Amino acid sequence: MAINLLPFFQHLIIKCGERGVMIVMRVSRQTKWASERSNIRGRYVVSGGSGNVDIVVLHHFPANILPQESIVNVTGAGDTLVASVLASLVQNPRGFEDPESLRKIVEDAQAAATLTLKSQFAVSPSLSL
């Protein structure tokens, strides 16, 4: 289903709760993704047809392992993740164009969501500037 939305949205971030995050995107052949090949261990698929069409990338990031007893409140964890991704994209608007910067963006977002899961608040106060 997400692939069917790519003509309308270049990047999709699908929050999967305790299963992690799925990024589905189309990127230009001028990005670093052009030199990547699908990597099952890396949890991503890179597909590009012939010619000058965009590349489609599906990348799964598993959730951080967190003992059940350390989870205080799930409210706001997904919102925290999305807010962190958006804040990273403000700093680096081309962050999705490079596999390493995408990994860093999602890792930071998952770390922020983990802080919120361990907090009694909807957003962990430790995330405030």
What is each model feature region?
Residues M1-L129:
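Conserved phosphate-binding/catalytic region of the ribokinase-like
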